[in-house]
Amino acid sequence: MRKIFLEAKGIQKSFGGVHALQGVDFKVHEGEILCLAGENGCGKSTLIKVLSGAHNADQGEVVINGHKYSNLTPQDSMREGIQVIYQDFSVFPNLTVAENIAMNWQIQEKKKLVNWKKVDEIAKSSMKNLGITLDLSLPVERLSVANKQVVAICRALLDNAKLIIMDEPTTALTSKEVAGLFEIIKKLQKKGIAVVIVNHKLEEVYDIVERLTILRNGKNVADGPIKEFDKKRFIECMTGREIETKYYRPKVENSEEIFSVKNLGRSGVFEGVSFTMHKGDILGITGLLGSGRGEIGEALFGITPPTEGEICLAGKKITIHNVHDAIQNGISYVPEDRLTQGLFLEQSIGMNTTIAAIRKYCRHFFLDYKMMRNEMVRWIKELNIAAPSPEPDIKTLSGGNQQKVVLAKWLDNSPKLLILNGPTVGVDVGSKADIHEILRKLAAEGIGIILISDDLPELEQNCNAVMIMKHGKTAGILRGDNIGQLSENLRD
């Protein structure tokens, strides 16, 4: 039986009137690989911050390696060997790989002159421990997401890590990169280092994780060996409800044509793309990284406008030179990265909801705030956004609810065509099901829906046609029950 390295007992934490953690118990054994799961807003992030000393618990205690803490500080946590790798990896983009890995060592040295040879030696040694090779002189901003993560792990090892907590480490990775990350985690385990993976995709972590702890509404709801959980039980524990798998297969053959493109292209990116959409259609676009799938959405919204081809919307030929043209013609776009492209993080939930259609709230050069607030409240209710009112900052919402706000922002513009690029990336299973239901309802109302995604189950369940992109060209369009053959058709 492995020794318990960390144990949190009866942790309670509130922010104002919101109870983020309500008597949570959590433990990690030495060298254990554990998954911490739960819907966005369940308390996972708050628990991580308590364990790292970033937040003090209102009640409860944390025991690390036999040492009891009632008010754990970041210094205490790091001294005990706890390292947290957040989704942004906390790297310095303009510094080199070596400088990032050896950063904490440089700070501890407290010297005015930097020993660059020593910095390189330390970074190289840390990478060697994991069997990894990266160009030490390369600025981190030029690395892939997966390699930025490797840099963060190497830095954690230099700080004598005994427990590494990874917050949603697979969100922005390809399946190949996920496999590479899991190989690194196995190497960490062999060195006796425990790893906590924060994740809400059971199928992704099933083969590497030993034990699973699930939180819901700030409370423990399940804990046990991973093999005791199938997908159905996992989802029910996380959401408190049963989520039925539905397949979207409407009959649209004789319905009204709402959108079409013919020989659409952008020089050097993609070419010869043609498709037609009818009322009720949800068209999926997929392909491997670099296939041109995301660039089609950006072209149709005018971010990087097409250089050739014909576009028809609602029976009318349109030209798109920029984003303004797209919006004026009734096209809306939900981007892949909501934090940097979809939201104003310093603004309220309500302002983010109405900002795209701000002109319709103007009355003689002034904003009609009463009208705006009524619409804000309507969208919160209609999209089931978990917010008490429109006034709180958007940052207070979970990822799934933030994504619903991005969706509301563009629906407030009354679009004829809605393009979504990876709309459920980093979204918990409950919010994911809600978003899918919203898209189906919109399609039934006559709004054209283009769903760009590499999540094959998402496409199979929610699209009645899927276009496959390969090397910037259309490789085929699957319809109806043939969509089940997606994985075979994606292979080169």
Regions found by a protein language model. Give the residues of each.
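Glycine-rich phosphate-binding loops of nucleotide-dependent enzymes
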Residues: R2-D492
